[in-house]
Design a protein with these regions (language model features):
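Glycine/proline-rich low-complexity spacer/linker segments in large multi-domain proteins
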Residues: 2-26, 35-39, 153-154, 177-210, ...
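Extended substrate-binding grooves/exosites of carbohydrate-active enzymes
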Residues: 2-38, 89, 97, 151, ...
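Accessory beta-strand-rich segments of carbohydrate-active enzymes
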Residues: 3, 9-15, 38-39, 53-57, ...
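An acidic-aromatic loop/edge-strand motif
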Residues: 88, 93, 100-109, 157-159, ...
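Beta-strand/loop-rich accessory regions of lumenal/periplasmic or secreted enzymes
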Residues: 88-90, 139, 184, 284, ...
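Short strand-edge motifs at loop-to-beta-strand transitions and within beta-strands
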Residues: 119-121, 161-165, 269-275, 663-667, ...
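Short glycine/proline/serine/threonine-rich loop/turn segments at secondary-structure transition edges
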Residues: 131, 171-175, 276-290, 673-680
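Intrinsically disordered, low-complexity Pro/Gly/Ser/Thr-rich segments with frequent PxxP/GP/PP motifs
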Residues: 264-279, 644-676, 685
């Protein structure tokens, strides 16, 4: 082992020989190159990304001395791409833990067996020319030691922040060598206990910047606006490096590229240039207007894009440029299924474009600063950003003192350093509206000092930190102002809607605006309570917005031993401790395919609201929910459908509606005089022209209304008009035979064993009543109660089966039964009345009594299986994707066609999926159109799959699901909502199946679709 100072366990030594933190910028040699902003085009910039030599050690104690020497032979080492995480390349293993530290909680000490990665990179320097050469690391996890040409240069930590070294004195013309030792853990790891995959290495870009001895080292842009926002002042504070004077010129261009003003000054060490801007075009997330400030010093040209905007709180409301805004946000981690924490620029932009396409206007950089170029994109595309310090000590909660590190004086410097480095690097970005002190670290004096330093440095932004407001630990809403007075907003995670309405808004002692920095945990099939939150947020100005947890499923793309690709989560690599699939909690899949939850969010936070005024006369109310722009960029499209077929449509292209205003529009459709079908009006809003984030015609929002036509009067099918049936009774069964069918009903089990129509058996096993669903991720808490009550292990007990009535045209059989699990009393006692008619129709009427004092039911309905080949689905209900009682705002009611496979949502952890709320009828057929038609006497929930609920319950990953040939159909009276209880409040009562008495009627009819008019059957009813 070689000797090196043990900085990694010394919180008093955070950096050795690093440059002072400063604003991010890249100098260029021409205005054109500066404007394009491709840093590789700058002659002052040299990327060191690429292939490095790499050697991994399980413990730093095994590292041999001399690896950093110029003549060291590293040819036997492996090659590793930088930037990367070494765990993504087979060294060590990815490790997911949410709260728990993966080592004993004994700060500042980390395990003796501390894994180390050694990196060597040779590079060529033509000449030095008495210049400064800065080596920049934009992200290294967790800490690193640096040597250049065999000489120790320095040390640094803070994984998600820039570390910069002036290495000019260590360079020589020709070949040079960098050697870096990265350690998996350091004392700073106690401050980086974020809910994420734990990965190590040089994971962000590495590059050289060559600068003159006297050069601009820092720039601080401040914009000020007068009270009525008609006059702006841009202040540019410039800091020089090199100790002598420099002639600085600055040129300001407006958003159209026209020159507004030019300033020039001779500066010594520091100086300020000011620009007065009359009638500035302001920056906001809807119109992200950016001015261009070119700063010239010698050969260097630096371009900073400047946004004029004013952030303030008045009357307990967050204002941007004097307007109350709603933050429609998400929490975003750096996560890539193949690259880990290494995020290419195009991937950042794709994320942001996808957010814009789904009406998201705000981002919390949970829980660390992002790549600086990410913030440039936020400036340009238009997002409100909460920039969060690289700080979380959640694991301290496990040892009984959540705030122990936040109160510990030996970590004060580390806390301040993380705030310092973030603010200094990111201070010039218009998109940043709040500085966040970190996440889930208790609350202590170290936080207060961070906040006070940031306010002193930059009073133009708000200070955020949620951890101070935990009601059980630190904050009394009645007396807590003094302890948290350094915080500008009241922030909470996952509060219930009732807490927001009945406690926060009613408390007269708390005047700050409320921001939900996390809510609606988007894990798996969910979230299901978005609409309820946003109804309340829109209603109250003090409720300033909310950030969904979280943007993407964190997962590692890997393979099984036999080569099947799958997305891994905690524990799949043998990592301990782990939190399983709790990292799979995003609005998008790891490959950024949207979950249905993202579509739900899009329509709920849409910037246009449509309400019915008088649908008989075509009157609707349109409200512009944008804060700054009118609706001239949108077209209002409308269509009227009858039974799922469009019968009328048009568009209104003149909806130039001012922000936060409403207007009545009259749509020229006709209402039929007689109710001869199901009529629905759909209003949607699409882009007039191409935008940077979406194409012309892209739908921004929609709303659907059922037209007041009245209930369709069904035509009668009399029993007398039907063919006769014969009934044969045996000790075991009832055999019911008609002209085209033969049904066999088991007297012992109380249900059909075959439904044969035209010689084809329509079922492959006996139908059964069911209450179980494969638990969703958001059922993780209620699941324990369900299983304790036996919902997952139901047996059906038949008390009696008897014929209630019969004649030559029909037979009615009543089955008395119960559903229950072992140990517990039955969950349900019920009667099922099965009536078979000469037409082949089966009418099911079930009356169920739910046991008292038990948890609400996951579902209640009939499950049946159809044989192989029944793959084609047609239904009239909410689609085209899955819909639930509390998760349906991204769906609409119409007629849809699908296949069984297409109706399965392949969540990374298998769970309940693919149900369709408020279905009126559905068919499941083979390729010839032969199959079953299901008609609800009242709307029902409909689901088809090649997996049973038990199959899905027992599978940990999709590849473990064994696809059945048969088609499993669930026809449910109701399915409980999905909510967001994996981390949020319990499912709201109105979305629970909690009825004590259930009445459910369903008509089942074998069909050959070519031989019938489907709607004629749907709009018929059997009468005496």
């Amino acid at each position: 082992m070689f000797f090196v100072e043990k900085y990694w366990e010394n919180p008093q030594v955070l950096h050795v020989n690093t440059e002072k933190p400063h604003a991010y910028f890249i100098p260029y040699e021409s205005e054109d190159k500066a404007k394009k902003g491709i840093r590789g085009n700058s002659k002052f910039y040299k990327s060191l990304n690429g292939q490095w030599k790499f050697k991994y050690y399980d413990t730093v104690s095994m590292v041999e001395d001399g690896f950093y020497a110029c003549n060291y032979n590293a040819n036997s080492w492996d090659d590793l791409i930088v930037p990367s995480n070494w765990q993504m390349h087979g060294y060590d293993k990815p490790h997911y833990t949410n709260v728990n530290y993966p080592y004993p909680c004994d700060p500042p000490f980390v395990p003796n067996d501390n894994p180390a990665g050694l990196f060597i990179r040779d590079f060529y320097v033509d000449k030095i020319d008495n210049k400064n050469v800065y080596l920049v690391f934009e992200g290294v996890d967790s800490c690193f030691y640096l040597w250049v040409n065999g000489t120790f240069v320095g040390y640094s930590q803070v994984s998600h922040m820039t570390s910069e070294f002036n290495i000019a004195q260590h360079l020589k013309p020709g070949n040079n060598r960098l050697a870096v030792m990265v350690l998996k853990w350091c004392d700073g790891s106690y401050l980086e206990d974020q809910d994420m995959w734990r990965m190590s290495g040089i994971f962000r870009d590495v590059y050289l910047l060559t600068r003159e001895k006297v050069h601009i080292s820092d720039i601080f842009i401040k914009t000020d606006l007068n009270e009525n926002l008609t006059e702006g002042v841009l202040s540019c504070e410039i800091t020089l490096s090199g100790g002598t004077s420099a002639n600085i010129c600055a040129l300001l261009k407006d958003i159209h590229g026209d020159i507004l003003s030019e300033q020039q000054a001779n500066m010594v060490q520091q100086g300020i240039l000011e620009f007065k801007v009359p009638s500035p075009e302001l920056w906001n997330a809807e119109t992200p207007n950016l001015y261009e400030l070119y700063i010239y010093n010698g050969e260097e040209i630096i371009l900073l894009k400047v946004g004029f905007r004013k952030i303030e709180i008045k009357d307990s409301v967050i204002l941007i440029n004097g307007k109350a805004v709603k933050l429609k946000g998400v929490n975003r981690h750096d996560s890539h299924p193949v690259l880990g924490h290494t995020i290419p620029l195009y991937h950042m932009k794709n994320d942001l474009i996808l957010m814009k396409r789904h009406n998201i206007n705000a981002i919390r950089t949970s829980h660390y600063p992002n790549d600086p170029r990410f913030l440039e994109l936020c400036d340009e595309l238009g997002f409100y950003v909460i920039d969060e310090a690289d700080l979380e000590t959640h694991g301290a909660e496990r040892v009984g003192d959540f705030s122990m590190i936040s109160r510990d004086p030996q970590f004060e410097a580390a806390y301040l350093d993380r705030m310092h480095r973030m603010v200094e690097r990111d201070k010039n970005h218009a998109s940043i509206i709040m500085w966040s002190l970190g996440n889930e670290s208790g609350y202590g004096e170290n936080h207060v000092k961070m906040a006070l330093w940031a306010k002193n440095k930059d009073n133009s932004r708000l200070i955020h930190y949620e951890g101070a407001f935990s009601p059980s630990l630190y904050y009394d809403i009645n007396t807590g102002w003094e302890a948290t007075s350094c915080l500008d907003v009241y922030s909470r995670m996952y509060p219930s809607i009732s807490w927001m309405a009945d406690e926060f808004l009613q408390n007269e002692n708390e005047k700050r605006p409320l921001v939900l920095c996390e809510y609606c945990h988007a894990m798996g099939n969910g979230p299901g309570d978005l609409k309820d939150y946003w109804d309340l947020i829109y209603k109250h100005p003090r409720l300033s917005g909310a950030f969904v947890w979280e943007w993407t499923d964190h997962s590692v793309l890997t393979k099984t031993s036999d080569g099947i690709e799958y997305y891994a989560y905690g524990g799949d690599f043998g990592d301990k401790p782990n939190d399983g699939n709790f990292c799979v909690d995003g609005l998008v899949y790891p490959d950024r395919t949207p979950h249905n939850g993202l579509l739900e969010l899009k329509n709920i936070i849409a910037p246009v609201r449509t309400e019915a005024v008088d649908l008989n006369s075509g009157k609707i109310k349109v409200t512009n929910l944008y804060d700054f722009i009118n609706l001239s960029h949108l077209v209002l499209n409308w269509k009227v459908e009858k039974d799922g077929e469009v019968i009328d449509s048009s568009e209104e292209d003149n909806i130039d509606l001012a922000p936060q205003s409403s207007s009545i529009f009259t749509l020229p459709y006709d209402i039929p005089q007689k109710p001869d079908g199901r009529y629905f009006l759909t209003v949607s809003y699409t882009l007039v022209t191409d935008m940077e984030w979406a194409e012309k015609g892209y739908e921004v929002a929609f709303e659907q209304f059922e037209l007041p036509v009245g209930k369709v009067e069904k035509h009668p099918v009399t029993k007398a008009s039907m063919p006769s049936i014969s009934i044969v009774e045996t000790n075991k069964e009832f055999i019911i035979q008609g002209s085209e069918f033969k049904y066999v009903f088991d007297r012992y089990y109380g249900c059909f064993t075959s439904i044969i129509y035209n010689g084809m058996n329509m079922i492959s096993s006996m139908p059964k009543f069911n209450i179980w669903r494969a638990p969703t991720d958001n059922d993780r808490n209620i699941r324990n109660k369900w299983e304790a009550e036996g919902y997952n292990r139901l047996d059906t007990h038949i008390y009696s089966v008897k014929i209630i009535s019969r004649d030559e045209k029909h037979i009615s059989i009543c089955s008395d039964f119960s559903l229950g699990g072992y140990i517990k009393k039955p969950v349900i006692r019920a009667k099922a009345l099965w009536t078979v008619y000469g037409s082949g129709d089966i009418l099911l009427e079930t009356q169920a009594k739910v046991s008292e004092g038990i948890p609400f039911l996951p579902r209640y309905g009939l499950q049946l299986c159809m044989p192989k080949g029944n793959e084609l689905i047609e239904y009239f209900g909410y689609g085209p994707h899955e819909s639930y009682l509390d998760k349906r705002r991204s769906t609409f009611k119409s007629k849809f066609e699908a296949t069984v496979d297409s109706m399965h949502e392949n969540y990374l952890k298998p769970q309940e999926n693919g149900s369709h709320y408020s279905t009126e009828w559905a068919t499941v057929t083979n390729l010839l159109g032969m199959g079953l038609l299901f008609i609800g006497m009242e709307d029902f929930s409909f689901n088809v799959s090649h997996y049973t609920p038990e199959d899905i319950t027992n599978a940990s990953h999709p590849y473990k699901l064994i696809r059945r040939d048969e088609t499993i159909i669930n026809l449910d009276y109701k399915v409980s909502g999905v909510g967001s209880n994996s981390c949020g409040p319990e499912l709201l009562p109105q979305y629970r199946l909690s009825e004590s008495d259930i009445n459910f009627k369903l008509r089942i009819k074998p069909i050959f679709k070519e031989d019938i008019s489907l709607l004629d059957v749907v709009y018929s009813e059997i009468t005496e």
